[in-house]
């Protein structure tokens, strides 16, 4: 059997909640708002598949560049390149200074 090349390959532990985090996500995560230029961390919520960024960006930090519908456009550094990542607010968390 050949290896799969799907979007969620190699994410067995990356997209897994701990025992205490299991269940429905709080509504406050869905209605949180961010401003342009704000720094946020990508923290994928595996219980919500819609608007999920690519798992390779899990744990990375980016700057909010704009909004597209309910989703936010982030600018994230990947190596030497700057990438644009589109994500729903459920998968983002504000950076604390």
Curated annotation (Swiss-Prot):
GO molecular function per UniProt: structural constituent of ribosome
Q: Name one GO biological process term.
A: translation
**PROSITE patterns on file:** RIBOSOMAL_L21E
Q: Gene3D superfamilies this protein is in?
A: Ribosomal protein L21
Could you tell me which InterPro entries the record lists for this protein?
A: Ribosomal_eL21, Ribosomal_eL21_arc, Ribosomal_eL21_CS, Ribosomal_eL21_sf, Translation_prot_SH3-like_sf
Q: Does the keyword Acetylation apply?
A: no
Segments spanning the bilayer are none
Q: Name one Pfam family in it.
A: Ribosomal_L21e
Q: Which GO terms describe its cellular component?
A: ribonucleoprotein complex; ribosome
Query: Keywords on this record?
Result: Ribonucleoprotein, Ribosomal protein
- Give a yes or no for keyword Ribonucleoprotein in this entry: yes
Q: Which NCBIfam families has this protein been placed in? A: PRK04306.1
The family database entries (HAMAP family) matched by this protein are listed as: Ribosomal_eL21
> Family, per the entry?
Belongs to the eukaryotic ribosomal protein eL21 family.
Official protein name in the record: Large ribosomal subunit protein eL21
**Coding gene?**
rpl21e
């Amino acid at each position: 059997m050949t290896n799969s090349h799907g979007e969620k390959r190699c994410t067995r532990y990356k997209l897994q909640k701990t025992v205490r985090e299991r269940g429905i996500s709080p509504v406050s995560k869905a209605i949180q708002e961010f401003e342009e230029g704000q720094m946020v961390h990508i923290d994928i919520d595996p219980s919500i598949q819609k608007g999920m960024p690519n798992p390779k960006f899990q744990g990375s930090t980016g700057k909010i560049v704009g909004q597209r519908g309910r989703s936010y456009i982030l600018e994230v550094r990947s190596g030497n390149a700057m990438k644009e990542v589109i994500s729903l607010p459920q998968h983002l968390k504000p950076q604390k200074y």
